[in-house]
Amino acid sequence: MTGVQTCALPIFYPSALADGGYDVDDYRNVDPKLGTLDDFDEMLAALHDAGIRVFVDIVPNHSSNLHQWFKDAIAAAPGSPERARYIFRDGRGENGELPPTDWPSHFAPSAWTHESVWGGTSNQWYMHWFAPEQPDWNWDNPEIEADFLHTLKFWADRGVDGFRIDVAHALKKDLSEPLRMRDTLEYDEPRNLEGTGILMDRNEVLEVYKTWRKLFNSYDPPRVAVAEANVQPSRMPLYASEETLGQAFDFRFIDAHFDAAIFKHCVQDSLALAKANNSSSTWTLGNHDQMRYATKQGLHPVVDRTEWLLSNGTSHPVDFQIGTQCSVAANLFILALPGCTYIYQGDELGLHEVADIPEDQIQDPVYLRNHKKAKGRDGCRVPLPWTRNGKNFGFGDGGVHLPQPEWFGSYSVEAQSGNDQTPLEIFRKALKLRKELQAAEELTWHHTTRDDVLHFSRPNGWNCITNFKGGKYPMPKGEILVASQPVVNGQIPAGTTVWFKA
């Protein structure tokens, strides 16, 4: 056991896996390739017996093309109730042969696909922010909100403790006619700070989450929710408000270089926004959509990561030791901060990105749909190593969905257990201490004699000091609780975080 308090499950619903399961066929079932609802209940009970809460992933922006309601929509006529569940529009051009707008999607050249691809005969187009197999729901239709409340209740009634809300900012869209073309709106990411943009982060979506919060609060204890909302930092607390979802991932650390000034700015800004909006900060260094943090820090900052992945990791060397050191130190840093911390699976092992997945085994649609110009996200999704050797490095008896490299064995749970200097044992100790040391969500910054060293304390005397780079730094007086690297002769090495009691 690592000492985690919550397990946030990856997507597990029935799916053709056009986008790793985020093309959902049925929101209230388990993919038969993975098990059954009875298996889910058994797992949930076992985790609860171990004192671990369980979160599940909810994908409210889109379904899959195999969802029964989308099949019904394709078979129905324009203007029908079935089509009103999705976003269908007539095309441009003399015969409707052009898509309604020139918007690209994340995974395809166009955000619109002609219904004929799935056998439709009405000459309309449907909208999808992501793959063509992921048609967007029409959240102006009350039937959609009612059905998602049904889904949330279905899982909460089974005992699920919380929900991760995928693409939480994208549900509501202004699709009033005439539809705007790309050059008349800021398309790529939300930039409107007032919540009045056209396609993302509209204030109306917060009203959806206020309704969800009422449902969550009807349970004892209330159900938790965390938004994956790629919005401007000043907008993030609106999703984390106690009136809406309650938490929102703060992604600022994910691409932040391991640097004292950058880290301090991220912390100060996030805590100030949370305080102003009566919400709580939520920290993370990685997720299933990002290159592993250890590899980011092991690569030189000027390296183009996309090109590096396309080269199968051969274009530039990775300093695996430095990368892992920085990853463990950064995780100890965020674990000491006020608020909630989410650790991406594998970070507790110091795992690096698997860059050399063979082309014929790549699963991420990003690769083919971007004409092989970006390798995608598979490298951080490779199944974890549990044993030094053996089939799948201990990850089950069947086949694994992505190939594991030979070097995985040295990062395995078996290889690290019992050695108190390994990332796994450091995490185990830190998570146990974190539970014991919880205090009011406040911190105080302390002066250091170097700009590349940060020192803060929590109200109960829990101190955290990080030496980001440069030479060794004198250890302040106090009892060392845990350190990401050994403190020898009272000196903190570079790339090290230490917790201590003053």
Question: Can you name each region flagged by the protein language model?
Answer:
Residues 1-478, 482-502:
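Active-site and adjacent substrate-binding regions of carbohydrate-active enzymes
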